[in-house]
């Protein structure tokens, strides 16, 4: 990790130092996804079977997972892991139930009633990556709010063979239909529908560059599907003072660095001693990690910033706008009112990012790449939509009519004005 003294940097150097590793949909990825999209749209299930054999090296008999497969997966899963998943589910449910909106109903003036109604998105699709580290925790983060929101149809896609923990978590959370389909083809199938895979209105979940590009494409297609967010490489910024435990700080940096070679981790501290001790702790802990090679690649483009004080630390963090922000300082909550840009915040020495990733209750699907300046972590609201209602009594209409007529005339929208004038003339 490169260590930089913040006050010694020029404005241009500061901007450069906070730049994330470049991401782009390379031409070959875009072309490959184009071909997959055209194939799945044209050939439906046939294309999905062929692509599973090509990419996943699995010859499927059925795209849909059977109830028997789900039951057998639950039987194979260790009881300890089942209990852990159930406990995490309880906390995630509690946090997302607290987000159920209170519907607004207000009389803006006498005889003029305005409301906000919330309705679930009817059909949602959840994408869960497979591979060597299947993200069954993401099933909880997506399926639980979908269920609480009241989505009428919840389907899930994951590459075959689907891990037992994913099947167990999906069934536990009430996912009705699970398809053993992965990659860009799964996103396309959910967006447009096939003979077997149900078309959905919105797609949620992370994935590799091909999945990300497929989500981008279907979200821009006229008859495609909306998406939760465009995901970039994962990232964490740790803000720590001289009282922080360097072993704790190092473990938080590494827990993010092990996600991928394109991940980025940042330490911001006013303490040069802590910075040095954290670097040493990182080196020690790296030797114990099975994914140390991946973590080392991420550390190569990561940074340590030495700030003048905690206020400057917060300013640097707000400028970077991290996906995850770990605050390991004395009286960490005192800084909360000054933090403007972060996806999820972890306050205090005993709130590592891992807790939010799995079981504290908050959602781990977060904006990356600086989008926390304008975007929020995934929540219940993402699985629903708002409708506004207005209802005017004859007297309420009459009292407001002049205001609307004047405004419509000023904008030269005569039909708007006339819609009021005609009614006004008929009120006795």
UniProtKB/Swiss-Prot annotation:
Catalytic activity of the protein: L-histidinol + 2 NAD(+) + H2O = L-histidine + 2 NADH + 3 H(+)
Cofactor binding remark: Binds 1 zinc ion per subunit.
Binding site for NAD(+): 127, 185, 208
Coiled coil regions, renumbered to chain: none
Annotated keywords: Amino-acid biosynthesis, Histidine biosynthesis, Metal-binding, NAD, Oxidoreductase, Zinc
GO molecular function: histidinol dehydrogenase activity; NAD binding; zinc ion binding
Annotated metabolic or biological route of this protein: Amino-acid biosynthesis; L-histidine biosynthesis; L-histidine from 5-phospho-alpha-D-ribose 1-diphosphate: step 9/9
UniProt keyword Nucleus present: no
Classification via InterPro entries: Ald_DH/histidinol_DH, Histidinol_DH_CS, Histidinol_DH_monofunct, Hstdl_DH
Residue sites binding substrate per the record: 234, 256, 259, 324, 357, 411, 416
A GO biological-process term: L-histidine biosynthetic process
Transmembrane regions listed in the UniProt entry: none
Active site: 323-324
Positions with a binding annotation for Zn(2+): 256, 259, 357, 416
Record-listed E.C. numbers: 1.1.1.23
Cofactor(s) needed for function: Zn(2+)
Matching HAMAP family: HisD
Described purpose of this protein according to its UniProt entry: Catalyzes the sequential NAD-dependent oxidations of L-histidinol to L-histidinaldehyde and then to L-histidine.
Name the record gives this protein: Histidinol dehydrogenase
Organism: Mannheimia succiniciproducens (strain KCTC 0769BP / MBEL55E)
